[in-house]
A protein has these predicted regions:
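Phosphate/ribose-recognition catalytic cores of enzymes acting on nucleotide-derived substrates
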Residues: 223-273
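Nucleotidyltransferase catalytic core that binds NTPs
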Residues: 2-230, 239, 271
Length: 273
């Protein structure tokens, strides 16, 4: 596996692999089994797979955890290599942001859910991804469904800016207790890890209600809130596949999304129905 630290090295690597199908897995590091599954999917689908590790400052708001975000470059390199990546791109901020030009995320999608409490977050996401897409020019890019809103916004970005890239959604990877894998899980203490499983249990409750014939969004959200108690709930929303809020669940067309605080750590999870 090649370790690439600047754009010139990426261009040289791509020149050596000209004409091959390129898969791309963008990450902020602190790689775990969820990221590993994305990398393995890329390796399966493409002739060459590139992983990026970059803690993108423009998607963090003032007071968020940019400085404390978990970083372990040596382990990230090990995980990417073990998963079969052909190259890992580890740029610094000066490489990615030589100027302050940015991209605005679509306001209708970026101002709800995560965007309601993190204004500007998705502008940072879209800006850095547009840069990576231009540098690497992949055929396919891989995103986990855990960040569903990000996934849908990226699909919109690619369509709107005419990037010739297939966005490949990948299923959420969970621990044995159902907790969705996340780099921010490293912030949780032992008792908080147990409490964090309530997010998944609330989604399981929702799925059981739908299976039993309950489709009312209000009823389902109320029952989910009981499961989440006493966690501080940021939101429970039930939407269609374009993130429009809906009153009734339609099977194979709906998504249930949760954001809640476990101690000081904000976690998200979702279920596609």
């Amino acid at each position: 596996m090649q370790i690439l630290r600047n754009i010139a090295e990426v261009k040289d690597f791509l020149a050596l692999n000209q004409g091959k199908e390129i898969g791309f897995v963008p990450t902020m590091g602190a790689l775990h089994a969820g990221h590993e599954s994305l990398i393995k999917k890329s390796v399966q689908d493409n002739e060459v797979s590139i992983v990026s590790v970059f803690v993108n400052p423009t998607q963090f708001l003032a007071g968020e955890d940019l400085e404390n975000y978990p970083r372990n470059e040596a382990r990230d390199i090990e995980v990417a290599k073990a998963a079969g990546a052909d190259a890992i791109f580890l740029p610094d901020v000066s490489q990615m942001y030589p100027s302050d030009i940015s991209i605005k995320a679509p306001s209708a999608l970026a101002s709800i859910l995560e965007g309601a409490t993190r204004p500007g977050h998705f502008d940072g996401v879209c800006t850095v991804l547009a840069k990576f897409f231009n540098i690497i020019r992949p055929m396919r890019a891989y995103f986990g469904k855990k960040d569903t809103q990000q996934l849908i916004i990226v699909q919109n970005l690619v369509k709107s800016l005419f990037f010739d890239i297939e966005i490949v959604p990948c299923d959420i990877i969970r621990a044995g207790d159902g907790l969705a894998l996340s780099s921010r899980n490293s912030y949780l203490g032992e008792s908080e890890l147990i409490e964090a499983c309530k997010l998944y249990r609330a989604l399981v409750k929702a799925k059981a209600l739908v299976s039993a014939g309950t489709f009312s969004s209000d009823v389902i959200k109320a029952e989910m809130a009981k499961v989440l108690d006493p966690l501080k709930i940021d939101y429970i929303e039930i939407c269609d596949r374009e993130l429009n809020s809906i009153d009734q669940i339609q099977t194979d067309k709906s998504i249930i999304l949760i954001a809640a605080y476990v101690g000081k750590t904000r976690l998200i999870d979702n279920l596609w129905l």
